[in-house]
């Protein structure tokens, strides 16, 4: 699930808005091709469907929670990529780009489980301090 959770948006950006749904469908074909049984495929599909932080879906397993948290946590280690997205790909000005990245990180932090928020609080605060 961790490897496949963003596959739809990576292979076709037009699928981004519903990439959690399309990705789960794509994962079925990939995993079936590699001989995974249907039970494991369904578990992976649920992780992919429920990883999307901007779509507030209940996490029904520890695996779903882990994939969703890891997806959000990854943003704190990819600030340069987020800045590139804002300034180069989206063509934003200095302040707008900075606010875009800060808002993305704030949303990501709010999506974390309670345990992950406690663990990543300091890192989140340090990254936000640099951006301020």
Regions found by a protein language model. Give the residues of each.
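An amphipathic alpha-helix signature
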Residues: 20-28, 45, 98, 102
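Divalent metal-dependent phosphate-bond-processing catalytic cores, especially two-metal-ion Mg2+/Mn2+ enzymes
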Residues: 4, 14, 53-132
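Short, well-structured alpha-helical segments
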Residues: 38-49, 124, 128
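His-Asp-centered metal-binding catalytic motifs of divalent-metal-dependent phosphohydrolases/nucleases
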Residues: 1-14, 19-23, 43-53
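Short helix-to-loop capping/linker segments positioned immediately adjacent to catalytic or ligand/cofactor-binding
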Residues: 31-38, 54-58
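Amphipathic alpha-helical segments within well-ordered protein domains
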Residues: 8, 24, 28-32, 106
């Amino acid at each position: 699930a961790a490897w496949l959770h963003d596959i739809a948006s990576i292979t076709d950006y037009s699928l981004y808005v519903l990439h959690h749904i399309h990705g789960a469908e794509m994962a079925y074909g990939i995993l079936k091709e590699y001989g995974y049984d249907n039970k494991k495929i369904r578990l992976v599909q649920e992780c992919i469907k429920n990883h999307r932080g901007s779509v507030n879906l209940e996490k029904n397993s520890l695996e779903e929670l882990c994939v969703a948290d890891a997806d959000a946590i990854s943003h704190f280690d990819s600030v340069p990529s987020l800045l590139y997205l804002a300034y180069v790909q989206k063509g934003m000005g200095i302040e707008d780009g900075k606010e875009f990245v800060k808002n993305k990180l704030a949303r990501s932090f709010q999506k974390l489980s309670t345990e992950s928020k406690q663990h990543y609080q300091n890192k989140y605060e340090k990254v936000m301090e640099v951006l301020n």
